Amino acid sequence: MEQTELESKLLALLTQPMRMDEMRRALPETGKNELKNALDHLIADGQVMKNKKNRFAVCTHYGCVAGTYLATERAFAFVAPDAPTDGAKPDDLFIPPGANGGAWHGDRVLVKLSERKNNRGRREGTVIRVLRRADRELTGALVQRGNAYFVQPASKKYPEVAIDCHHLGDAQP
């Protein structure tokens, strides 16, 4: 993501949670709509979060990190965190079974870090939000179970997808 000057200022400012009015006082030359648009962009990109008290801060303040979801053919996955500005590549995060938050391979996600590490010493996390979906073209076999239809993806990195019988067209299992 190309950051604007305002977004860079906000990231430097939001190391501690702040309300919108506090940000406006700290950046008096910035219009309300301009500030809101920059904040919305940073939130959508997984760099800033808003807490329940309507305070904004960088995601790391809340123990979260954004990255790319990397599914495996088994039930667990990894997230490759975004590289920080200092260039050091952070270790991948382990996502245990059931903690994928509906993410699929290649999605950009926001992960809440856990304090514990897995048995290999990797940090664990839970996907709390899918920020951006990866491409959704999927190749697989159509299967029928009773009255239900599913596509079994060719790659086990993807889950089965339920298909409404009205959307089958001419496809047959």
Predicted feature locations:
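Charge-lined substrate channels and their catalytic hotspots, especially those that engage the 3′ end
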Residues: 1-173
